[in-house]
């Protein structure tokens, strides 16, 4: 949509405002510059907004809704295939340039705001600032720094003899003083939220469900110091005990909560804690792995999804705010591909209605965007004109939001986003593992030749 000297733009179509209110079938949205000026029924549209001074855009069969919010991204991860690949490969300068490129992919997918849940180096905060001043196209970001981890956390999977990799998306903390120092340094780096690694991902056996990477005292230190500095606090917590400890400590946001139980739910409700389940990552692994993984890994992921389906459905029914997030940045969830899939999962597995799922990816998700959340996530006068126009009705078919070919417009701050797909980019040798074969080449006597196996 080209710029001209009109006063603003009036869009006519089905209006889904981001709340749980039923869509306005004959609706209109008016924006002037970067801000929404009016939203409502066509019959109530003030006369000036109908005139030629406002660009008139009729959108029959289309839905006009807030731009999506992805509540769990990793814009600096570059679609790494493993923790090792992320921690050990790719220079920081190249990672940064790649992050800027990938931010545009995210925006083109209808995601106008995002929460970056952990970064390598300090890429996310600096990219956020570069986008905000207009250097690169991308969503509005709220960001974490490198998440704080202990030896039992997600990121310290390397041998004790090995130095903690500087490229890892975490900082290793060993004492209360180191926790406080890490938080204060990240506050100095202008992060929006302090995130910790509250559990590992080694939930292969049931006994691992009772493991928390930090003590209750350490969790209190994190939540208290983050709050003192005006920052949010968040945790990666899959195990039951890591969820319970963070909830008792008063964290603002819990990622995953796969093994949440009734006690956890009660404390989350009491302390007004949000959950970002991020089931897209697990479901994609299950869908992709039958051809390339062992039974034990598949069983572990299936067990976690089953537990999450039961516990998180209860949490939703109890009224815990849930945010859609995808963990885009890892290879199972490439940028620009899966940002709307979590809504379908919420509907299919957690008992959400499509309208509730949309709300979780719009207005409810603003709760994790402390700096600008009250300016996005809802079609309302005074908020940013961050708008997605899609051919179809996501309240009837939530999957239409996964089909970028159905997007007529994505507006960010009233500016139409260029939706031209980006050309594919070659992966450099220094971005990936250096391996000879994807498996072991063993001699098979019955065949009289070598066979590649696991």
Regions found by a protein language model. Name each.
Residues 44-65, 187:
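Active-site metal-binding motif and surrounding structural segment of the metallo-beta-lactamase
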Residues 84-97, 158-181, 232:
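Active-site mouth loops of central-metabolism enzymes
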Residues 62-130, 151-154, 217, 249:
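Metal-associated gating/positioning segment near the N- to mid-region
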Residues 198-310, 323, 328-330, 350-352, ...:
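Active-site core of metal-dependent hydrolases
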């Amino acid at each position: 949509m080209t710029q001209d000297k009109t006063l603003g733009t009036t869009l006519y179509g089905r209006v889904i405002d981001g709340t749980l209110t039923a869509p306005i079938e004959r609706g209109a949205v008016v924006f002037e510059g970067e801000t929404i000026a009016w939203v409502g029924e066509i019959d109530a549209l003030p006369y000036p907004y109908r005139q030629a001074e406002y660009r008139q855009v009729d959108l029959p069969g289309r839905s006009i809704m807030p731009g999506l919010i992805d509540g769990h991204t990793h814009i600096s991860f570059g679609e790494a295939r493993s923790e090792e690949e992320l921690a050990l490969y790719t220079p920081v300068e190249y990672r940064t340039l790649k992050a800027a490129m990938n931010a545009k992919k995210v925006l083109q997918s209808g995601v106008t705001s995002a929460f970056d849940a952990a970064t390598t180096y300090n890429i996310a905060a600096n990219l956020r600032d570069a986008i905000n001043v207009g250097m690169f196209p991308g969503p509005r970001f709220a960001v974490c720094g490198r998440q704080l981890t202990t030896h039992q956390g997600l990121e310290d999977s390397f041998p004790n003899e090995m130095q903690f990799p500087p490229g890892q998306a975490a900082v290793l903390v060993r004492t209360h003083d180191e926790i406080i120092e890490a938080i204060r340094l990240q506050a100095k780096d202008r992060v929006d939220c302090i995130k910790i690694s509250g559990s590992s991902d080694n939930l292969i056996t049931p006994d691992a469900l009772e493991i928390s990477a930090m003590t209750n005292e350490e969790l209190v230190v994190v939540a208290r110091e983050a709050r003192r500095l005006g920052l949010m606090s968040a945790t990666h917590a899959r195990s039951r005990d890591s969820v319970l400890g963070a909830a008792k400590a008063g964290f603002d946001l819990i990622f995953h909560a796969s093994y949440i139980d009734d006690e956890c739910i009660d404390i989350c409700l009491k302390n007004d804690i949000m959950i970002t389940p991020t089931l897209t990552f697990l479901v994609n692994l299950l869908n992709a792995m039958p051809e390339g993984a062992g039974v034990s890994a598949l069983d572990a992921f299936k067990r976690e999804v089953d537990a999450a389906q039961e516990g998180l459905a209860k949490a939703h029914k109890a009224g815990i705010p849930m945010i859609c997030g995808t963990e885009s940045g890892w290879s199972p969830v490439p940028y620009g591909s899966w940002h709307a899939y979590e809504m379908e999962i919420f509907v299919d597995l957690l008992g959400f209605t499509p309208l509730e799922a949309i709300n979780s990816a719009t207005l409810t998700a603003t709760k994790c965007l402390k700096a600008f959340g009250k300016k996005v996530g809802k079609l309302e006068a005074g908020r940013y004109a961050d708008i997605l126009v899609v051919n179809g009705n996501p309240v009837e078919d939530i999957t239409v939001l996964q089909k970028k070919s159905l997007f007529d417009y994505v507006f960010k701050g009233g500016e139409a986003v260029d939706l031209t797909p980006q050309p594919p980019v070659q992966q450099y040798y220094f971005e990936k593992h250096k391996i000879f074969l994807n498996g072991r080449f063993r001699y098979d006597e019955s065949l009289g030749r070598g066979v590649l196996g696991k």
